[in-house]
Amino acid sequence: MEGPPLEVLKSSSPVKHSTFWLFMGLAVLVGLLTGGLVLYLHRRKRHIPTDDPIKALEPDKKLSVSNSNTIFLFGDFQIFDRDGADITKLFTPLLKELFLLLLVNSVKNGRGLYAEKLDEILWFGRSEQSVRNNRSVNMAKLKSILESIEHCQLLKEAGYWKLEFDYDFWYVDYHSYLDLIQAKEKLDEQHIRLLFELAQRGNFLSNHNYEWLDQFKAEISNEVIDVFLIYAHSAKAHNPEFLIQIANFVFNFDQVSEEAMIIKCRALSSLGKHSLAKKAFDVFIKDYRLIYNEDFNKNFNEII
């Protein structure tokens, strides 16, 4: 009576065994196909530029994770090579101005600077021969520095000198800044914090006073103030403590910004810090009087 069951068990064992390995093989195959598809999409996404400047910057990713292949223009000018070594000292005063002049214009407009304009800015009043010699020598020196840092080159195209960076390998804070402000009406708190982090190193090239730079500095200051105030007045701004930070940051660019003062005082009041709100107002009207030599035309109760 026990014979037939034993025969059944004996014949079913290899079936189960082969079925098991069949499913295992299919699982491995599906895993490999899925992994390959994910890798393909990841690489494709990395190399296709997005039309949305907001999506181009990840909100949960800090702008400056490390100093490797990094150029800072906000605050002190600094440039770091791929190993994170500060190579700013390699730039003589003239080379530094040449580099910054080309960098700012290249990042801003993508074309760089017209050759004649470059000569006019750096060697105005010199003979044509002197200008040619100076340009040739300093361009060669700049190329020598750039050749040592990779993924960056000095080019001349259609009469324009420009610097070209591969932003997959380089972080340039001014480039990230321009990406952020292109869609200032769409910025949320996360992206405002990115801008805050970017600009908190200081004003744009704060220790450099080139005449040609004044226009860029004024434009950036106005843009930063504009972006922060647009956000502060939007429906997205509902964090009073963050609004106070924004107001304080605007004051770094404009000491007597009436809008920043109102934002700060109202935010402090909403937190129940009425005495601090009044103190902030008093500091503002004192600075206003010193700068404009006249009294501010509103009282505290009017702005709250």
Predicted segments, located by residue:
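Membrane-proximal extracellular "stem/stalk" segments
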Residues: 1-14
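Short, low-complexity patches enriched in S/T/P/G
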Residues: 11-23
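Intrinsically disordered, low-complexity protein-interaction/activation regions
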Residues: 21-263, 269-304
